[in-house]
């Protein structure tokens, strides 16, 4: 159950924060995604109300109306959504039965639980995508050690074991080295009540994502394919448009994303995470990895690199307003995550004024989080003409925000 800390202030929110007649969107979640929605809401003339676990949570620091509560508690959800024009999320972990109850009570969930279940349960997602003919690896439910053994045999040991629910940034995923390790894992996790599935490992060459926005009325808009680079299971950087993508593959990915959004009834932003690999003819091909029905880490570049950011678009979509232009504003945009390290670190806030000195176009976004190893505490966005140079400068600026020192002979003036 999520930690709830009242601290100072009214735990039941601040209704006076909203101008009469202004649409109120209830956001279930208090992380950096909700934090960045708040900026977009101000520009759109919308007002947000958060359901947050703590007054000092990332989004709660910047939102005037915060209801303190637990997203697994239906009564707390009711407090947060009372009077809201629409209800949306910055994570997929709200119990589906609670979301269904909200709809039955007359609230406007966007996306709706029938769509969101495909981002909550990986087996449900795989089964539905297979029905749609989307490219997915072989998969199977794993309910016993025998199931695990059978799948190991079927795939010649190319097994990725996953928790069906939860898990992100590399958590809830296991790559057993042998059959006995797999069956031991399954036995242990099953005893602990973890529902499991297995997939055949994909020999991928890089990771891509396509972001799609869809309104309840059915309008759809997509951004160009993005390449993401993972380090230790965590997204370290994203580059858009993804370099070296064949135009036909770009079109196929966009069509795939739009089909998934439409057929699943997704509203708001949908991120379709993709594995890229070489097919039998040697051409780059794609398979679906996972889905996220909310703004996504690989879409943060849109804050500076697109006419319409993913955060603005998400709020437009859940309100069933016309979608914005998704055209790019530069030949290349790079997002570099600011990740906490495990060594002595300087205060990242003190580093902000100097982080963009060598490249003034650097845009810093910090999340108001404490530093922990590997934790996403912010990101840097940078647009440019040259992919290699833009990647280098974005990485160095992100590194400086953690370590307060320039690496690779890059120095502030």
From Swiss-Prot:
A single MF term (Gene Ontology): metal ion binding
Annotated pathway: Purine metabolism; IMP biosynthesis via de novo pathway; 5-amino-1-(5-phospho-D-ribosyl)imidazole-4-carboxylate from 5-amino-1-(5-phospho-D-ribosyl)imidazole (N5-CAIR route): step 1/2
Keyword terms: ATP-binding, Ligase, Nucleotide-binding, Purine biosynthesis
Top-rank taxon, per record: Bacteria
Region (Disordered): 1-21
Binding site for ATP: 122, 162, 199-202, 207, 289-290
Function: Catalyzes the ATP-dependent conversion of 5-aminoimidazole ribonucleotide (AIR) and HCO(3)(-) to N5-carboxyaminoimidazole ribonucleotide (N5-CAIR).
UniProt family annotation: Belongs to the PurK/PurT family.
Protein name, UniProt field: N5-carboxyaminoimidazole ribonucleotide synthase
Species, as recorded: Corynebacterium ammoniagenes (Brevibacterium ammoniagenes)
């Amino acid at each position: 159950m999520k930690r709830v800390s009242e601290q100072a202030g009214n735990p039941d929110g601040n209704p006076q924060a909203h101008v009469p007649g202004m649409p109120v969107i209830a956001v279930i979640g208090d992380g950096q995604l909700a934090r960045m929605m708040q900026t977009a809401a101000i520009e759109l003339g919308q007002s947000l109300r958060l359901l947050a676990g703590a007054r000092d949570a990332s989004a709660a620091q910047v939102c005037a109306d915060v209801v303190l509560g637990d997203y697994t508690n239906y009564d707390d959800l009711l407090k947060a959504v009372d009077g809201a024009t629409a209800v949306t999320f910055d994570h997929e972990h709200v119990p589906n039965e609670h979301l269904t109850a909200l709809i039955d009570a007359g609230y406007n969930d966007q996306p709706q639980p029938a769509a969101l279940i495909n981002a909550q349960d990986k087996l449900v997602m795989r089964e539905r995508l297979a029905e749609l003919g989307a490219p997915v690896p072989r998969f199977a439910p794993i309910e016993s050690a025998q199931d695990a053994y059978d799948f190991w045999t079927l795939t010649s040991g190319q097994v990725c074991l996953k928790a069906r629910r939860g898990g992100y940034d590399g958590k809830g995923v296991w790559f057993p080295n042998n059959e006995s390790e797999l069956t031991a894992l399954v036995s242990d996790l099953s005893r602990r009540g973890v529902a499991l599935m297995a997939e055949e490992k994909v020999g991928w060459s890089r990771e891509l994502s396509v972001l799609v926005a869809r309104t309840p009325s059915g309008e759809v808009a997509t951004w160009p394919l993005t390449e993401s680079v993972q380090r230790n299971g965590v997204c370290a950087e994203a580059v858009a448009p993804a370099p070296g993508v064949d135009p036909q593959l770009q079109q196929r990915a966009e069509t795939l994303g739009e089909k998934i959004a439409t057929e699943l009834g997704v509203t708001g932003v949908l991120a379709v995470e993709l594995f890229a690999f070489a097919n039998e003819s040697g051409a780059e091909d794609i398979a679906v990895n996972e889905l996220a029905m909310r703004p996504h880490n690989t879409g943060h570049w849109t804050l500076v690199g697109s006419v319409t950011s993913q955060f603005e678009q998400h709020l437009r979509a859940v309100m069933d307003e016309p979608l914005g232009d998704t055209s790019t504003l530069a030949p290349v945009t790079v997002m570099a995550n600011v990740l906490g390290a495990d060594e002595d670190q300087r205060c990242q806030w003190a580093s902000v004024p100097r982080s963009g000195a060598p490249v003034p176009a650097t845009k810093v976004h910090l999340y108001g989080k404490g530093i922990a190893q590997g934790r996403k505490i912010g990101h840097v966005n940078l647009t440019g003409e040259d992919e290699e140079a833009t990647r280098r400068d974005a990485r160095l600026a992100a590194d400086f925000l953690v370590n307060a020192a320039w690496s690779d002979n890059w120095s502030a003036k």
